[in-house]
Amino acid sequence: MPTSSSFKHRIKEQEDYIRDWTAHREEIARISQDLALIAREINDVAGEIDSVTSSGTAPSTTLVDRVFDESLNFQKIPPLVHSKTPEGNNGRSGDPRPQAAEPPDHLTITRRRTWSRDEVMGDNLLLSSVFQFSKKIRQSIDKTAGKIRILFKDKDRNWDDIESKLRAESEVPIVKTSSMEISSILQELKRVEKQLQAINAMIDPDGTLEALNNMGFPSAMLPSPPKQKSSPVNNHHSPGQTPTLGQPEARALHPAAVSAAAEFENAESEADFSIHFNRVNPDGEEEDVTVHK
């Protein structure tokens, strides 16, 4: 009958509408919970910043470490979708017949939407962490560059001239992007690259160190330690012994060695310069005859 078929078709449309509305309502509830969690997290971080600032410690370190750890530990687990029966008047369902289960396609679409939202949140959190660490790297390289400028201030190499020359040689425009974090990260890394090139030009202007490093001789230019001269005190040791004295010990024993050498010379000057002759008697015994000068 056409009336019954149209009635069934109308009931089916109403069931589909109620099912879609239920899914949308659950999605809105999940989004509200996520927003509440994000707001609570922002309040916690803001409270930590206030406490750290009042204690006199730099808040950037604590905030960056917290954000970086949370971005690495962020788990992208899509929540399960629970089907609910729409309630009508007096807490009864609008249709006495049992509701059909949601089709797999609709469940897959809902989970895919939730998964995409979690991915976006995790990527944004990780991007913010990378931006904070790029600022830390740039601050560290600025300190190193300042030390290099002080170290080579008496040389004929000017840091400002080298830096301006490098900037003019390789000036590449930064790609425009809608993300301020990505643009800032590119600017910080570009600044770090220029600072490293300037440091390399200050330390090795003619490329000698780089050539030695490429040839595999990193210690070819290092001077060899000076050899210590042997003293008369060391000559009295037995042939099997090779005493080694450090430089401070050699300095400490130098006066003693000089005095020992002087005594040795005096002993030689005052030594007995008599000549000993051995003469054999007729009876076969030797006779020691000493002739003094």
UniProtKB/Swiss-Prot annotation:
InterPro entries: Cent_Immune-Sig_Mod (IPR051176), CEP170_C (IPR029300). Belongs to the CEP170 family. GO terms for molecular function: identical protein binding. The gene is CEP170P1. This is Cep170-like protein. Residues 78-110, 217-270 are annotated as: Disordered. PANTHER family: CENTROSOMAL PROTEIN OF 170 KDA (PTHR15715:SF17). Residues 227-245 have a biased composition (Polar residues).
